[in-house]
Amino acid sequence: MRVKTGVVRHRRHKRLLKQARGFYSGRRKHFRKAKEQLERSLVYAYRDRRQKKRDFRKLWIVRINAAARLNDLNYSRFMHGLKLANIELDRKILADMAMNSPESFTKIADASKAALTK
C-alpha cells in the first residue's frame, strides 16, 4: 500500500510557518523562504546570546570609565585601586552605581585613589 505524506507534510509545514511568524513578507508565507530564514534566525540567536554578554561588559566599562574620569581617574587606574583596596564589586554593580548614585560611586573612587597613593 502506498503511503502519502499529506498529513505529515501539512503538519510539518504548519509548525515551521508558525515559528516564522513575525518575519517579513514571503519569509513568513512561503515554506522554503520561511525555512531558510528560520535556520538563519536560529544562527543569529545562538551567536547573539554569546555576544550579548560581551556587549553588556563593554557598556559597563564605558559607564565606569566616564564616572571615574569625573573623579580624576581613568578606568584602569580606578579598577587597580579597587583591587588594592580589597573592594570586590563587579562591573555591573559599579556601572549601576555610576548611573544611579554618583555620590556612592565618588566614595568608592576616593577609596580607590587612597589605595593607589599608599
From Swiss-Prot:
The keyword Disulfide bond does not apply. GO terms for biological process: ribosomal large subunit assembly; translation. Coiled coil: none annotated. InterPro entries: Ribosomal_bL20, RIBOSOMAL_L20_CS, Ribosomal_protein_bL20_C. Keywords: Ribonucleoprotein, Ribosomal protein, RNA-binding, rRNA-binding. Gene3D superfamilies: 6.10.160.10, Ribosomal protein L20 (1.10.1900.20). GO terms for molecular function: rRNA binding; structural constituent of ribosome. One of its GO terms (cellular component) is ribosome. PROSITE patterns: RIBOSOMAL_L20 (PS00937). Belongs to the bacterial ribosomal protein bL20 family. Binds directly to 23S ribosomal RNA and is necessary for the in vitro assembly process of the 50S ribosomal subunit. It is not involved in the protein synthesizing functions of that subunit. This is Large ribosomal subunit protein bL20. It comes from Sulfurovum sp. (strain NBC37-1). The gene is rplT.
